[in-house]
From Swiss-Prot:
It comes from Lachancea thermotolerans (strain ATCC 56472 / CBS 6340 / NRRL Y-8284). Coiled coil: none annotated. Is probably involved in a pathway contributing to genomic integrity. The keyword Transmembrane helix applies. This is Increased recombination centers protein 22. Residues 20-165 are lumenal. Keywords: Endoplasmic reticulum, Membrane, Signal, Transmembrane, Transmembrane helix. Residues 193-221 are annotated as: Disordered. It is found in: Endoplasmic reticulum membrane. Residues 1-19 form the signal peptide. InterPro entries: TRAP_alpha. GO terms for cellular component: endoplasmic reticulum membrane. Belongs to the IRC22 family.
Length: 221
């Protein structure tokens, strides 16, 4: 049974999340069941979640617009953003999104705040899982909350006009067009000229033997 790229991505991501849940990172633990409602959209692309890929080129920016709602019973503060990018084909991390401090943005109970995170995608061509994190401070504890992942695809770089491969293709196409034009227009013209020479009259007239005709039809001299 063959898995599609999306199915492989989901399985790979679940594997990573389970591994993180088993291994805590000090006081910055991944709490997948934290009572926060965190959604985001990509301003450059439509967020497809795990159902479709967001397509980028290497070096593009992905600007994530977050909406954070606090459903805990205490006030909290959003203090940082981070995450990771997972390589679907190699089943390993492709890049870490360096944790960056924001705010702190204080969020009351049942309160909502919005913020942005710009991620520069320096990746090779291929399929990846983007897994953003939000760092939240609750009382004296800082927790790393894993948000919903999204699939991203890095497209092959556009071919430059001066790329040797592109120039070779242009030369081959030019040679084919020239050969086609030659055999289509010039060859028939030359052949027609030779045939015309063969058919050109030389000025002589051959007489028809009319001796077999009846006497009344024979041409009188």
């Amino acid at each position: 049974m063959k898995f599609s790229g999306i199915q492989v991505s989901i399985l790979a991501l679940l594997r990573v999340c389970l591994a993180e849940a088993d291994s805590g990172e000090g006081n910055q633990e991944a709490l997948p069941h934290a009572n926060f409602d965190i959604t985001y959209e990509c301003l450059e692309r439509d967020v497809g979640g795990l159902s479709s890929f967001m397509e980028f080129e290497n070096g593009d920016n992905a600007t994530l617009q977050y909406k954070f709602t606090n459903k805990e019973d205490l006030n909290v503060s959003v203090v940082g953003l981070g995450g990771r990018i997972y390589d679907v084909q190699k089943n390993e991390d492709a890049a870490n999104i360096s944790a960056s401090a924001i705010g702190p943005l204080d969020v009351d109970v049942n309160g909502t705040t919005e913020f942005q995170h710009v991620i520069k995608l320096v990746l090779k061509e291929g399929d990846y899982v983007l897994s953003p994190d939000v760092y939240v401070q609750k009382e004296n504890e800082t927790m790393r909350v894993v948000t919903n992942p999204s699939l991203i695809r890095i497209l092959p770089p556009p071919m430059s006009f001066f790329n040797p491969k592109f120039m070779l293709v242009q030369m081959v196409l030019g040679a084919l067009i020239a050969a086609f034009s030659y055999f289509t227009f010039f060859k028939p013209s030359a052949s027609y000229g030779r045939d015309a020479k063969k058919l050109k009259p030389d000025g002589s007239v051959s007489r028809m033997d009319s001796s077999w005709l009846p006497e009344n039809h024979q041409k009188k001299k």
